[in-house]
């Protein structure tokens, strides 16, 4: 995509993240009238708290993926089995997640397009269809965890009167109610997420205060790296839950909810500055909430015989057995926090599904129709899971392991295209990431992929003793590695024949 192509307006037939009338107006807030700071590179708009407030929103929606029920389960298992020793890893994993999400935001702001749209434009049909299918599979896997988490919380809060499958139906329906708020403006929907995040923070902070974890051990766990063979699985789980493939697609679309002219360099720089501040603050809040959960279970169950048996489904009951009822039973406080996590992540999952499907397939349809399609794709497998696993907490935990592996498999198909695109000057123009940032980003991506690869190998190692399972696993592994290498090769420096090929594409775009 040439610089001219990047700046051309979207055609009427093309899918777009937000219509112009839906975007939050930023221009003219706390700045001189008719100011154009591109004419004076040494000058830039002054920092404005009002502008920061107007840019605040997308980062907090993005941060929900760091607080979904899958992350909560990883937190509680890390605390129960590893104690305080993996808090340092949680901190660095969150920092890695921040880097990936800032690159995603950079892509969306600088190009005016989100990741799924750019993948549709940059990859051949067969490759983008594979990427779309992988993104949808990752989204369905995440959605199962999120909806089941909400259903578990509803079951607890109803004292078991509402079965798991009914909780799934309730979660699916109220998801549409929340998304309906977007018709009244994106800020209304963002306010709902702020309330849900605040609910999580208050619930888990109350539990933190009730159980009184050791502040000294918390500080040591955050500052002193420590890893043993016994806690490797929990360490891999922490890293694996932080990078969610659908969230990479989502953030590049969310940042387009603010009116930013990509043709004006100072506007893009300003937006990136405010989005960086907002995203950092949002993930700092998510880190604190995750620490609350980890330390509560470290204080309560580390070193006990039941530590290995605790999962999302039975965690509340274990807490209740240990700390009793009281005026505010800890079981219900836990359930309220999990419900807020499940509801918020389910909404963002549906939201991400709209952008992924619309971007890859260029579907021009009303948002509620896309939401219905994406919700239907996820609700059927989730309902099956709820009916099959309703009576077994241990089976739910085993299913969660499978779903974590599923997310691990999909990570390269979001992260590699992102890094290739933000490193490409033809797409990003002057906002292409610099060589040092490229190097750091690729090292981080390789580390995350390697860690998740370890999880996959460990999980599928049992297939080595079964010939029937071994053959398809080997075939899948070969195809998987070949496609990942293909994606990486697309990000290498353009060869002369590729430049010639891209130049032939430009007249075709002019005909559009």
UniProtKB/Swiss-Prot annotation:
Q: Give the primary localization class.
A: membrane
Q: Name one GO molecular function term.
A: metal ion transmembrane transporter activity
Q: Name one GO biological process term.
A: positive regulation of reactive oxygen species metabolic process
Q: What happens when the gene is disrupted?
A: No visible phenotype under normal growth condition, but slightly enhanced resistance of root growth in presence of Cd and increased accumulation of Mn and Zn under Fe starvation.
Q: Which UniProt keywords apply?
A: Ion transport, Iron, Iron transport, Membrane, Transmembrane, Transmembrane helix, Transport, Vacuole
Q: In which tissues is it expressed?
A: Expressed in vascular tissues.
Compartments reported by the entry? Vacuole membrane
Keyword field contains ATP-binding: no
Q: Which domain of life is it from?
A: Eukaryota
Signal peptide segment: none
Kindly give the Pfam families that the UniProt entry links to this protein.
Nramp (PF01566)
List the membrane topology term(s).
Multi-pass membrane protein
Which parts of the chain span the membrane according to its record? 52-72, 80-100, 129-149, 161-181, 189-209, 235-255, 277-297, 323-343, 371-391, 402-422, 440-460, 468-488
Task: State a GO cellular component annotated for this protein.
Answer: plastid
Induction note? By iron starvation.
The intrachain disulfides are: none
Q: Does the keyword Ion transport apply?
A: yes
Family that this chain belongs to: Belongs to the NRAMP (TC 2.A.55) family.
Question: What NCBIfam families is this protein classified in?
Answer: nramp, Nramp_1
Q: What is the recorded function of this protein according to its Swiss-Prot or TrEMBL entry? A: Vacuolar metal transporter involved in intracellular metal homeostasis. Can transport iron (Fe), manganese (Mn) and cadmium (Cd). Regulates metal accumulation under Fe starvation. Acts redundantly with NRAMP3 to mobilize vacuolar Fe and provide sufficient Fe during seed germination. In association with NRAMP3, required for optimal growth and photosynthesis under Mn deficiency. Exports Mn from vacuoles in leaf mesophyll cells, making Mn available for functional photosystem II in chloroplasts.
Q: What is this protein called?
A: Metal transporter Nramp4
User: Which organism is the protein's source?
Assistant: Arabidopsis thaliana
Upper taxonomic classification of the species? Eukaryota, Viridiplantae, Streptophyta, Embryophyta, Tracheophyta
């Amino acid at each position: 995509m040439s610089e001219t192509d990047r700046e051309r307006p979207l055609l009427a037939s093309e899918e777009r993240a937000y219509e112009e009338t839906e975007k939050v107006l930023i221009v003219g807030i706390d700045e001189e009238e008719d100011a154009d700071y591109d004419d004076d590179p040494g000058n830039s708009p002054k920092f404005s708290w009002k502008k920061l407030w107007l840019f605040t929103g997308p980062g907090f929606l993005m941060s929900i993926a760091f607080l979904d029920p899958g992350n909560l389960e990883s937190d509680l298992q890390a605390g129960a089995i590893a104690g305080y020793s993996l808090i340092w890893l949680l901190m660095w994993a969150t920092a890695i997640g921040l880097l990936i999400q800032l690159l995603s935001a950079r892509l969306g702001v600088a190009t005016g397009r989100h990741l799924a749209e750019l993948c549709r434009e940059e990859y051949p049909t067969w490759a983008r269809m594979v990427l779309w299918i992988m993104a949808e599979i990752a989204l369905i896997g995440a959605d199962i965890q999120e909806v089941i988490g909400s259903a578990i919380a509803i079951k607890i809060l109803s004292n078991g009167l509402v079965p798991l499958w009914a909780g799934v139906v309730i979660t699916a329906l109220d998801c549409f109610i929340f998304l309906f708020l977007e018709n009244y403006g994106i800020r209304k929907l963002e306010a709902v997420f702020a309330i849900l995040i605040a609910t999580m923070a208050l619930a888990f902070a109350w539990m933190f205060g009730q159980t009184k974890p050791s502040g000294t051990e918390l500080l040591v766990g955050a500052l002193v790296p420590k890893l043993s063979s016994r806690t490797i699985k929990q360490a891999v789980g922490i890293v694996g839950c932080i990078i969610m493939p659908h969230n990479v697609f989502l953030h590049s679309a969310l940042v387009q909810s603010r009116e930013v002219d990509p043709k004006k360099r100072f506007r893009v720089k300003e937006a990136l500055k405010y989005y960086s501040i907002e995203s950092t603050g949002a993930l700092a809040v998510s880190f604190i909430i995750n620490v609350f959960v980890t330390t509560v279970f470290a204080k309560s169950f580390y070193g006990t015989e039941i530590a290995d048996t605790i999962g999302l489904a039975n965690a509340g009951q274990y807490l209740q057995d240990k700390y009793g009822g009281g005026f505010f039973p800890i079981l219900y406080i836990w359930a309220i926090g999990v419900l807020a996590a499940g509801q918020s992540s389910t909404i963002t999952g549906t939201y991400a599904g709209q952008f992924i499907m619309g971007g890859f397939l260029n579907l021009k349809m009303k948002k509620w129709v896309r939401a219905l399609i994406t919700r239907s794709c996820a609700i059927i497998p989730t309902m099956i899971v709820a009916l099959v696993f309703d009576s077994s907490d241990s089976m739910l935990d085993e299913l969660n392991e499978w779903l974590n592996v599923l997310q691990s498999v999909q990570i390269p198909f979001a992260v590699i295209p992102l890094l290739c695109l933000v490193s490409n000057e033809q797409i990003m123009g002057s906002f292409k990431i610099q060589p040092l940032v490229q190097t750091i980003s690729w090292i981080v991506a390789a580390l995350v992929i390697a860690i998740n690869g370890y999880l996959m190998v460990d999980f599928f190692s049992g297939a080595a003793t079964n010939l029937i399972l071994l053959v398809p696993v080997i075939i899948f592994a070969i195809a998987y590695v070949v496609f990942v290498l293909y994606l990486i090769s697309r990000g290498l420096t353009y060869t002369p024949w590729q430049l010639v090929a891209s130049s032939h594409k430009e007249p075709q775009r002019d005909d559009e």
